[in-house]
Structure formats: C-alpha cells, structure tokens
C-alpha cells in the first residue's frame, strides 16, 4: 500500500463518519477472534475474553470482544447504517436471523484441528451449520438473503495455532508453505460455495494480516523487535491464492459479488506509524511471558489510540477503525468496496 493511499486513509479515518441509513437489510459475520463478539463466553476454552481489561472502551464493557473496544465488523455494521451491533449467535433470538448474526469464534480455523489445544471453539464448518439452522428456523426469504451483507475473516489460526506451532501439530512437517496454503484454499472454496448455496451473494472475504508482525510471533519466531519473514512469506502465499479464489468466484459463480480485503497491505505496521500510531510491536495491555491475552484486571496503556495492538495478537479499536474504513471505502478491497456491496 503506497504512502499516498494511506494518507487518504488517514484523512478518512479522522473525518466524521457519514451514514445514510441502513443499506443492506441484514449483516452476517463469520470468522475467528478478530470478529468474535461473545460466542466463546460459555465454552470450555482458553480463547475467551469476557473479563477486564477487554472492553475497556466498549459501551457494555467486557462482552467477549478481543479488543479494548469495537471490532472490525462492529464498525462496518455502523458504517452500513445498522443502529445496533450485530448480536452473537450464542445470544441472538431466532427472529434476529432476519437482520443478522455474528457466528465468529475465537480460535476457529479452516482446519478442524486448528487451536484444539485451546479447548472448545466453533469451526467455520460449524458456523455455517449454525447459519443454515438460523435462517431456516426463522424462514428468512431467499430474496432477502441475497441482499444481505456477509463478512468472513478466517485462516489466521491455521498458521498461529497450527502450522507454526510444532506441538501438538505436525502440519509444518507434512506440508511446504505452498502446499499448506493450497490445502487451506481447497477447504475455503468448499465453504464459500456452501455460503453461496445458502443465499449469500455479497461477501467481503478478508485476507490475512501480517501475522509475522504481531507481538506474539515477533517474540516466538524472531528477536522480538522485527517481524518474522518466514511467517509473513507463508501468509503471502495464502493471500495470493485467496485473492485468486475470490476473483474466480466472481467470474464463474452466478450472481456472486465477492470482494477481497487486503489486510496484509492494510495491516503494515509501518503504514500505521505513518498514520500517526506510535507503538507497533508492543501490546497496550499487560501480557504474561509466553502468553498472548491480557492479564485480567491489570494496567493498560493510557494512550490507546497510539497503539496498533491491544494484546499480543489482537488490534486496538483505533486500528480496527482504520481497517474497517479502508475496506468499507475500497482502499484495501477489490473489486468492490464494502460500501458498494452494502448499497447495491
């Protein structure tokens, strides 16, 4: 992403948000901890954050969101004109399938075994099953589903909590980075086809960010000061294949209006420094050595708008705002902006 583009992003970021009323009739979210807003709260899992200091800047306090405030789908929902946050599937009423649900689950991945060492999580396969059950029980019309906005952000854990974690996983010994990315894309293709069969036509597919630049990976796979090139290079292979998959869907699948969101370029720590952030490789909250989540009820940084990362893996609300607006306005999404998907 060029500096010129990010200068535009900075202007958009600081400008007042203008919303012209709800555009899409409903919004459905699938993914992992980047999008989870409470689905893991009652699971037997280490991947849940329904405690302080998470939600430090969120109106309702700790809700299960892996940030100090709003997540990317929260902000995209606001930009799309939704008056209320899309509820987590675990807490939603049946009729809310007409306006949207969030099925995302911290720790989830494309592969079923991903993050199994963390305990229970809702895989992307199960998330789609939950979606099918929800829209079927609520009898949501097919015509309405085709007008809804969909967002899916999955795959990070297949690298963080699988491929680059030697125990209890052996995928790195079995696959080269190219082979592994291809195996994930095969799974992804199947799930996107299933989502399309369930009525989805307007889907924002998020690529992976620069995982090698997260504080967790910088500590475990580098010297703690620079990004892990090995991890980022593996992610780039996956992203290229995912980008191609989205473009292929648009060409071959009837009615598909999928867009690819380039989180890798959009999540460049140097770009965030250029935007005015001051801390890119350190968490805002207190994280114990060898862990990734905030220590409960411990001090956090006062200048949260200057930090890219909230904990050792997840971004601050300020970062989420930049990414959400960049994808919504088409700065890091192609061939459509999410704004186009929401209103067409």
UniProtKB/Swiss-Prot annotation:
The keyword Kinase does not apply. Its EC number is 3.1.1.-. One of its GO terms (biological process) is lipid catabolic process. Glycans are attached at residue 303. InterPro entries: GDSL, GDSL_esterase/lipase, SGNH_hydro_sf, SGNH_plant_lipase-like. One of its GO terms (cellular component) is extracellular region. Residues 1-21 form the signal peptide. Keywords: Glycoprotein, Hydrolase, Lipid degradation, Lipid metabolism, Secreted, Signal. It is found in: Secreted. The keyword Ion transport does not apply. The active site is at 33 (nucleophile), 311, 314. GO terms for molecular function: hydrolase activity, acting on ester bonds. Pfam families: Lipase_GDSL. Belongs to the 'GDSL' lipolytic enzyme family. This is GDSL esterase/lipase At2g19010. It comes from Arabidopsis thaliana (Mouse-ear cress).
